[in-house]
Curated annotation (Swiss-Prot):
GO molecular function, one term: GTP binding
GO cellular component: cytoplasm
Compartmental location: Cytoplasm
Name of this chain's protein: Adenylosuccinate synthetase
């Protein structure tokens, strides 16, 4: 049976939640493999809106196993709150439908405090634009081998030792930032209190998933954010603190790379970005405002207004290469309805030279200027289209040109937030 990885191929907010939900109906397991609760998914099912940050999108589908892998950093208090909210919407969540990898690092209150203090202390031009939820510092502790992990919650003595090790690092850091030392006993008490609520979902996820694979079950690997926020291949330092590209799916849950049969890149028909960092095709004019208003471009987590621009084929071609994308799901095509002329970024001008990729150095990225190709728009609506025959001729030409420029075919086309408004070209789950 084919297993599918879903990754964002831009800066996040591409519409992954809808596509994952659309695919999850045919998957047996849905697994989150990286990120934290800094990335939000909005799902619309039968007119009901679900907003998820920490939970995999599969939880709203009955009879599926949802998994939070070791590549995720988990805020246990946020997770329990989110579970309660989703349960209140009539969704059943139990240890039979949700598993958390025992080796998943936890986000502690000290991580959020450090995250926010650093952003406040940063001078203009050095702010990353984080959500302030502690994801970056939690990953720092993971790499620094001082994380409190899910399994540590099962034994108080081990838990206290882990907390003490973390505070040896955090207290001097906090002193330098002018923050009070951590109340060690209060933190331990908080963790002891939350422990039973988390431990009932704890499992050796690597073992469970490998058994599911041998049994021929279909696994859908769900990424958060977007490949341009990848810690290695994104617009560093304006990136997230984890690997976002498809290769992380294997290490983020504990399966081999051979478990991945198809990589689906989610791509918006235009470009958006939240927070700081380079954005060559950004629009500060009426067209950019129109894209933002029509696309309802406000962050699910922060409510921050997203920066908007024309479709950047250079960036998407690059992320399709680094993630090994087999096909893309092109979303929000309907937002482009009514534009008389559309532009696609097909290259950059950097210090008088033409570039066909985004350079690595941050100062070079900041100086890249877009080279555009113009295409005629369309006046008819594409919203709700469910077949190619429903699309205006110029919309089809736009999609075909995108395919040519990014060297990757369109596998799915999304024309509204409703999961049924999807045109299937290639089935990612096909064996």
């Amino acid at each position: 049976m084919a297993n599918v990885v879903v990754v964002g191929a831009q800066w996040g907010d591409e519409g992954k939640g809808k596509i994952v939900d659309w695919l999850s109906e045919r998957a047996d397991v849905i697994a989150r493999f990286q990120g934290g609760h800094n990335a939000g998914h909005t799902l619309v099912i039968d007119g009901k809106v679900y907003k998820l940050n920490a939970l995999p999108s599969g939880v709203v589908r009955g009879g599926k196993l949802s998994v939070i892998g070791n590549g995720v950093v988990l805020d246990p208090w946020h997770l329990i709150k989110e579970i309660d909210i989703i349960r209140g919407q009539g969704v059943d969540i139990s240890p039979e439908t949700l598993m958390i990898a025992e080796n998943t690092p936890l986000i502690l209150p000290i991580h959020g405090e450090l995250d926010r203090a650093r952003e406040e202390a940063a001078s203009k031009g050095t702010k990353i634009g984080t959500t302030g939820r502690g994801i970056g510092p939690a990953y720092e502790d993971k790499v620094g081998r001082r994380s409190v992990r899910v399994a540590d919650l099962a034994d108080t003595a081990t838990l206290e030792a882990r907390v003490d090790r973390a505070l040896q690092h955090h207290d001097p850091l906090r002193k330098g930032l002018g923050i009070e030392p951590v109340d060690r006993d209060a933190l331990v008490a908080q963790l002891v209190e939350i422990a039973p609520h988390i431990l009932k979902y704890a499992a050796p996820v690597w073992k469970v998933l490998n058994e599911k694979r041998r049994a021929g079950k279909r696994i859908l690997f769900e990424g958060a954010q977007g490949a341009l926020l990848d810690i290695d291949f994104g617009t560093y330092p304006f990136v997230t603190s984890s690997n976002v590209i498809a290769g992380q799916a294997a290490t983020g849950v504990g399966v081999g790379p051979g478990a991945i049969n198809y990589v689906l890149g989610i791509v918006k028909a235009y470009t958006t970005r939240v927070g700081e960092g380079p954005f060559p095709a950004e629009l500060d004019d009426a067209d950019g405002q129109r894209l933002g208003e029509r696309g309802h471009e406000f962050g699910t987590v922060t409510g921050r207004k997203r920066r908007c621009g024309w479709f950047d084929a250079v960036l998407v071609r690059q992320t399709c290469a680094t993630s090994g994308v087999n096909g893309i799901a092109l979303t929000k095509l309907d937002v482009l309805d009514g534009f008389e002329t559309l532009k696609i970024c097909v290259g950059y001008e950097l210090d008088g030279k033409r570039m066909d990729y985004l350079p690595t150095a941050a100062d070079h990225q900041a100086r890249c200027r877009p080279i555009y190709e113009e295409m005629p728009g369309w006046s008819d609506s594409t919203e709700g289209a469910r077949s190619w025959a429903d699309l205006p001729a110029n919309a089809i030409k736009y999609v075909r040109r995108v395919e040519e420029l990014i060297d990757c075919p369109v596998a799915l086309l999304s024309t509204s937030p409703e999961r049924e408004d999807t045109i299937l070209v290639t089935d990612p789950f096909a064996d």
